[in-house]
C-alpha cells in the first residue's frame, strides 16, 4: 500500500500529519472517533464532545471549526493518569526527529514533572509488538500545556526517537490532575523542529544546525573568547 505521495519543487516539503482523524470528526457506528483508543481502565474519564457548544464558557478559535470537528475531554484524577491515544506502524531509527502539537482547553493544575503532574501530548516509541503486554514504550518528548482557566491554547514540541521503532503512539495525558482538559487538532509531523543548538560547559554556543541542513560552528579560547566561526 502507498499513501501521501508528493512531488514538489523546492528545498522543503509540505507538512504530512501522521495522526489520523486528528480532529475526531470521523466516528464509527458506536459514535467513537476512529483510529483512537481509550487508555486501560480510563473509559469512565473520557468523553467525546462537540467542539463548540452554546453553553461552553470558552469557545474554540475559528481555525479549528470544520465540519463535525469534535474534542476529547479527559477528566483529571488526583491518584492516576488518564490517557487517550493513537498508535500506528512506523519503521524508524534512533534519532529520527518529529514535531508534535495540538490544541487544549484545560482547567488543570500547574505542571510539576517531579511529582508527575501534567497535562500534555506525549509521543512514545516501541520496537516490540504493542498487542502484547511485554512491549515497552519509550518517550521521545512531549508538548506540555500551561495551567489555564479554560482558554484554548496551542502547544508544539520537538520529538526525538529514543530507540529504533516499529510503532509510534501519540498520547493525550492528564496525570494526577484536577478538573478536565479538552483536546483537538492533534498532529505529528515527520520532520525536525526548529534549530538545534549545542553548548559547551561554559554556556558558549559551539554549533547551530538549521532545519534544512546548514550548520555553523564556533571555537573559543580558555577565556571564552570567540576564536573561530565557520558556516556551511
Predicted regions and their residues:
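Beta-strand elements of repeat-based all-beta scaffolds
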Residues: 97, 107-108, 136, 192-210, ...
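Extracellular and organelle-lumenal recognition/adhesion modules and their flexible linkers in secreted
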Residues: 1-200
Amino acid at each position: 500500500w502507498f499513501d501521501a505521495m508528493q512531488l514538489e519543487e523546492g528545498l522543503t516539503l509540505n507538512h504530512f500529519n501522521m495522526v489520523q482523524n486528528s480532529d475526531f470528526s470521523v466516528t464509527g457506528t458506536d459514535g467513537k472517533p476512529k483510529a483512537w483508543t481509550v487508555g486501560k481502565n480510563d473509559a469512565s474519564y473520557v468523553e467525546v464532545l462537540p467542539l463548540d457548544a452554546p453553553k461552553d464558557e470558552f469557545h474554540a478559535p475559528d481555525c479549528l471549526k470544520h465540519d463535525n470537528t469534535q474534542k476529547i475531554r479527559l477528566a483529571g484524577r488526583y491518584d492516576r493518569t488518564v490517557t487517550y491515544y493513537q498508535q500506528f506502524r512506523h519503521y524508524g531509527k534512533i534519532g529520527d526527529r518529529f514535531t508534535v502539537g495540538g490544541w487544549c482547553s484545560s482547567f488543570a493544575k500547574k505542571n510539576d514533572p517531579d511529582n508527575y503532574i501534567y497535562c500534555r501530548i506525549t509521543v512514545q516509541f516501541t520496537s516490540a509488538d504493542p498487542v502484547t503486554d511485554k512491549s515497552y514504550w519509550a518517550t521521545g518528548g512531549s508538548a506540555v500545556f500551561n495551567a489555564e482557566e479554560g482558554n484554548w491554547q496551542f502547544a508544539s514540541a520537538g520529538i526525538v526517537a529514543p530507540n529504533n521503532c516499529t510503532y509510534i503512539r501519540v498520547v493525550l495525558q492528564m496525570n494526577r490532575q484536577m478538573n478536565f482538559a479538552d483536546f483537538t487538532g492533534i498532529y505529528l509531523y515527520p520532520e525536525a523542529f526548529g534549530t538545534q543548538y549545542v553548548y559547551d560547559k561554559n554556556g558558549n554556543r559551539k554549533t547551530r544546525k538549521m532545519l534544512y541542513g546548514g550548520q555553523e560552528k564556533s571555537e573559543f579560547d580558555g577565556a571564552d573568547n570567540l576564536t573561530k566561526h565557520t558556516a556551511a
